[in-house]
Amino acid sequence: SLLAQSDPEFRMVFLIGRSLPDLWRDRLAAAIAPLEGARLVALPTLPHYMAIKRAYAMATPETASHVTGFRLDDDDAIDRDHIARMRATVAALLPVAGLEAPLVTGSNRGFFLERKPEGNALFEVVEKTPIGLGLAMTTRVGVSENIFRRNHRFCGQYYNTYTDANTPAFIRTVHADNDSDPHASGKIERADWDSAAPLIAQHFPFDAAMLQRL
């Protein structure tokens, strides 16, 4: 989904441990090679938040006054216009929210793709509290906080927070290897594949048939 963004002007750090075998590091490097602004960074063992802060610093342009960073796991997807919409939203809201205060932006509406041996299931979701997938924080350069600082569900308690409830903006993959509880905080309904297919094709760089086979 990163390669399909309508706005390609962004930087992405792929953070790995130095113990990752060369075979898999080379495979990852080849996979991200077509992505402009991508950078593969291997760090020694560190507390998670410290490693994230280092990665953010490496991706920040020297001339920037503010930086916007967002969360994305390797088994999830964002819609084609995520970067463009995030940029426009931040440009509109930051002057109102204040240039010095962190601003959190994201999306509430999307899909959960549940992988099952008997056949994958699709659920349409409208979250009540912010989902981490694609959630972004904008701060002044040099501010130590980023979007990983707090539990994403509680962002509205700590930061000015805006989430879009209209656009299908994410697909979260639910499977046995998830390291967090993949539950929805709000509305969740089983989706019919045929009915969901047009929305998936409109907003994402793959089709419903591919998701069924995944």
Segments and roles (model prediction):
Residues 1-9, 34:
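Short, acidic, metal-binding catalytic loop of nucleotide-sugar glycosyltransferases
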Residues 10, 37-39, 102:
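Short, conserved active-site loop motifs that form the nucleotide-linked donor/cofactor pocket
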Residues 12-14:
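Hydrophobic/aromatic residues located in beta-strands of well-ordered beta-sheets
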Residues 17-71:
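Active-site-proximal specificity loops/subdomain of glycosyltransferases
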Residues 20-24, 79, 113-115, 179-182:
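Short catalytic/ligand-binding loop motif for oxyanion handling, primarily in non-cytosolic enzymes
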Residues 24-34, 121, 184-191:
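Short, aromatic/basic amphipathic alpha-helical patches
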Residues 47-62, 70, 77-161:
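Conserved catalytic core of nucleotide-sugar-dependent glycosyltransferases
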Residues 128-214:
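C-terminal catalytic/acceptor-binding lobe
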